[in-house]
């Protein structure tokens, strides 16, 4: 299709890119529908457009869980980036050749930029074949020249500037938004053309052979690397008894918890790169090198456990938030990933498939746990029991519907007039902004919480 009608194909994919940007970036329901559509396309490729994958329909389960979570509950912090991770995981399962080669060979179909030259040559050939295409090419070449020359002329003469001032002021904001969306949609369209052309040609990337690594070099490198982790863990664990002692040094572990997660992410990514790099060497399975990799995985698990301990201590002191809850879930997922890496050193495991399963299941669990309600219920229970000194209500402005049942219980049981006033103000603000919400941001939880908040505000007014 692209060889016969390249411009029509590009325009169609650009329109699809515009629909995707509008739906995914500005609509929760658009995100949901986009995810399910991507899952359907990738599964169709697995079942109809390529070799039949055994058990491929299981990927509909996490997609359905995520869709149900978005329809039932508020999801204030689940961004389109997580959706992209889910779609990538689905694609890794569905694409042909998933079991062959290293990680880069397996994800290479998602980066079809080698087809960029073929797409550009096809567009040029089609444009030169017709008069309308040549006119469009001339307009496209003239646009950047007009922009540059126009800017220079506007600065050179005040009368010329005054002539266009009213037009530019009225169209500046509109053109900025339209141009930004058009450029983004066009880039997505070009990417989809490259992806389509690659699939149409059914290219299979050549697999790179393993390198002949030096076991001494790898052993020394991994030994020094593990020594750094050992030193870090020894120094960090020296203050662990003080942190675990009731009422001891809260400022110490609060500082640890603020920095621990980001340090953990950087260390985990670095360790993952080390694992993938070492496993590309033929000597990776030999005794000393394999033992050093095992030690590195074990030290990484200890680091994750230490960081998770700090986070739990921080939650015990300052309460639970969505970010702290999601951080804890990511720590657990990282621990499972590195445990699988350790096992794969002694027993062959499909690590890419396991990673995709782990990512999809983590997103499904996070979506179905009703995180906002869990955070509010936990904090209210601890505050009413006297385990939490202060009740911070500012975070609930992001998810008032999820927190409404717990806050109604707090409103009925607390005797603090200032806290009651804060809860009522939160409810009134949520009810006032509800009128401006569009239909695609609706959920079952939002409908149920409206009655609770209205009843609480009316009861307080009486």
Protein language model annotation of sequence segments:
Residues 365-390:
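Hydrophobic alpha-helical transmembrane segments in integral membrane proteins
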Residues 1-7, 47-56, 119-135, 162-163, ...:
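Juxtamembrane membrane-water interface segments of multi-pass membrane proteins
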Residues 134, 168-184, 249-269, 320-330:
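Short aromatic-rich membrane-water interface segments that cap or initiate transmembrane helices
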Residues 1-44, 294-306, 310:
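Alpha-helical transmembrane segments and their cytosolic membrane-interface
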Residues 226, 349-372:
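Internal/C-terminal transmembrane anchor helices
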Residues 397-462:
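Extracytosolic and intramembrane catalytic regions of membrane-associated proteins
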Residues 143-159, 227-245, 306-312:
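Alpha-helical transmembrane segments and their membrane-interface junctions
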């Amino acid at each position: 299709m692209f060889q016969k009608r390249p411009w029509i194909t590009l325009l169609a994919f650009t329109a699809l890119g515009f629909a995707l940007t509008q739906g995914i970036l500005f609509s929760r329901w658009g995100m949901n529908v986009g995810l399910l559509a991507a899952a359907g396309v990738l599964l169709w490729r697995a079942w109809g457009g390529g070799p039949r994958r055994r058990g491929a329909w299981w990927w509909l389960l996490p997609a359905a869980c995520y869709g149900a979570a978005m329809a039932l509950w508020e999801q204030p912090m689940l961004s389109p980036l997580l959706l992209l991770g889910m779609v990538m995981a689905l694609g890794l399962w569905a694409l042909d050749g998933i079991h062959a080669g290293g990680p880069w060979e397996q994800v290479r179909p998602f980066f079809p930029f080698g087809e960029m030259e073929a797409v550009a040559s096809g567009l040029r050939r089609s444009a030169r074949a017709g008069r309308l295409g040549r006119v469009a090419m001339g307009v496209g070449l003239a646009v950047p020249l007009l922009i540059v020359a126009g800017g220079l002329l506007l600065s050179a003469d005040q009368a010329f500037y005054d002539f266009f001032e009213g037009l530019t002021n009225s169209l500046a904001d509109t053109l900025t938004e339209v141009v930004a969306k058009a450029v983004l949609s066009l880039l997505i369209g070009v990417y989809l053309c490259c992806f389509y052309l690659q699939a149409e040609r059914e290219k299979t990337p050549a697999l790179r052979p393993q390198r002949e690594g030096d076991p001494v070099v790898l052993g020394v490198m991994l030994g020094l690397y593990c020594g750094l982790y050992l030193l870090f863990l020894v120094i960090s664990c020296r203050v662990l008894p003080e942190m675990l002692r009731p009422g001891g040094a809260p400022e110490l572990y609060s500082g640890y918890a603020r920095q621990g997660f980001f340090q953990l992410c950087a260390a985990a990514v670095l360790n993952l790169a080390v694992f993938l790099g070492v496993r590309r060497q033929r000597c990776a399975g030999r005794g000393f090198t394999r033992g050093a990799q095992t030690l590195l995985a074990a030290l990484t698990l200890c680091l994750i456990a230490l960081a998770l301990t700090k986070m739990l201590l921080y939650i015990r002191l300052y309460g639970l938030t969505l970010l702290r809850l999601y951080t804890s879930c990511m720590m657990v997922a990282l621990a499972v990933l590195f445990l699988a890496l350790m096992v794969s050193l002694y027993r062959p495991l499909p690590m890419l498939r396991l990673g995709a399963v782990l990512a999809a299941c983590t997103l499904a669990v996070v979506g179905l746990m009703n995180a906002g309600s869990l955070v509010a219920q936990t904090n209210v229970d601890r505050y009413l029991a006297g385990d939490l000194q202060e009740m911070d209500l500012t975070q609930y402005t992001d998810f008032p519907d999820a927190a409404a049942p717990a806050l109604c219980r707090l409103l009925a049981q607390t005797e603090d007039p200032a806290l009651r006033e804060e809860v009522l103000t939160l409810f009134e603000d949520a009810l006032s902004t509800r009128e401006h919400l569009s239909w695609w941001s609706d959920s079952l939880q939002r409908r149920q919480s409206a009655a609770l908040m209205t009843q609480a505000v009316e009861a307080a007014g009486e």
